[in-house]
Amino acid sequence: MPSLPLLLLLWAASSYSFPVFHNGDRQNVETVWKYLENYYNLGKNMQAKNVNGKEMMAEKLRQMQQLFGLKVTGNSDPETLRAMKKPRCGVPDVAPYAITHNNPRWTKTHLTYSILNYTPYLPKAVVEDAIARAFRVWSDVTPLTFQRVFEEEGDIVLSFHRGDHGDNNPFDGPNYKLAHTFQPGPGLGGDVHYDLDETWTNSSENFNLFYVTAHELGHSLGLTHSSDIGALMFPSYTWYTEDFVLNQDDINRIQDLYGPSPNPIQPTGATTPHPCNGDLTFDAITTFRGEVFFFKGRFYIRVNRFMPEPELNLIGILWPNLPVKLDAAYEASMIDQVRYFKGSKVWAVQEQSVLRGFPRDIHSFFGFPSNVTHIDAAVCEEETGKTYFFVDHMYWRYDENTQSMDPGYPRLTAEDFPGIDDKVDDVFQKGENFYFFHQSVQHRFNLQIRRVDDSRDSSTWFNC
């Protein structure tokens, strides 16, 4: 009979190998199995109830969790299931698009393309412009050039299809598998197929045709999916923003295949923030129902006491109608709102919805003078309902109860907040303290004794 330590070891190994389905929802088995079949090359002839099938499923789950930046457990936990249900590209995350050093590529640098048909949701001219801009995303950072042809079939053919369309990769109707592409080569090689049933747009609503096309063209040129959540080539659809900039991860990978742009000034891309980067600064910080949200570019970093690690995600995932590169934010907990600032505009948000009538102008909404063009930082003191707006080295105070500015402001920040001598970049309240941020340093200002009692690196919020 095996010893107790051996039995425990066997139990641990089996619990690690076999996926667990939470809440007794056996429907999840089919969801996970089908997802791993489609995107992770899980054998179609395997059965989930078979021991080998369970082991293989757990291994494929770990691959998926690794790529998506999830906790790697081999189990179908709720976070993994949520990721699986998001709209995404139909190209597999593994073979034939395996991440290897032998990715297929075009052997020529001048490629042609043709548009076979159109979506009914957009005018033809808008479709053509979106596709042309998507090609420019890649020609701007490589030696590649692209030309549309009309009388012949291009190297890359773009077309819209519904359901089973004869390429062994059927579409599934609205809101899930958006498009798929074939790797470089003759025939279907490089071709882009869109799901005709999707609502294609040229805005942040539904699915942006330019953004999806730019992603699919990455595959047309030989790129695989990226594990960088900020990359264009991340597998799931990430909401489009008007100031789109190609991520540096995408630039590095496409230049590995085709070389750099011939332009004398090499383009640089956006980068995804890493919470434990000691030099990391933030655009805005706010609390919300006990959590803290740190905003940077298109991203937020979310911290609460129930999460062992900070959550990095895209602003558009939670708030698709908010701008990116915010200036400031604060929570008005007495009315269950968070207010976000960019330039001279303010957005009032409850839950995930921007309230009707917003954005509003800060001059008419709060009463700022016309020479205030933006807000650097803001915080609402919980006990008093007074909101402090910091601009350069001055601050204004606003009464949330009377909805008016207090008289006698602006005042110098350093006079009323001793120790806060630099411009305030961000601020929020936690307990009896205001946390002031300047560049990558935070100062804890004790509201009871009215002075700074601690200063440290900003990344300490992320358990670094």
Swiss-Prot record:
Q: Which residues bind Ca(2+) 3?
A: 172-173, 195, 198
Give the protein's cofactors: Ca(2+); Zn(2+)
Location relative to the cell = Secreted, Extracellular space, Extracellular matrix
Q: Which SMART domains match?
A: HX, ZnMc
Cofactor remark: Binds 4 Ca(2+) ions per subunit.
Binding locations of Ca(2+) 2? 155, 187, 189, 191
UniProt-listed PROSITE patterns: CYSTEINE_SWITCH, HEMOPEXIN, HEMOPEXIN_2, ZINC_PROTEASE
Q: Which GO terms describe its cellular component?
A: extracellular matrix; extracellular region
Catalysed reaction(s) here are: Cleavage of the triple helix of collagen at about three-quarters of the length of the molecule from the N-terminus, at 775-Gly-|-Ile-776 in the alpha1(I) chain. Cleaves synthetic substrates and alpha-macroglobulins at bonds where P1' is a hydrophobic residue
Q: Which GO terms describe its molecular function?
A: metalloendopeptidase activity; peptidase activity; zinc ion binding
Q: What is this protein called?
A: Interstitial collagenase A
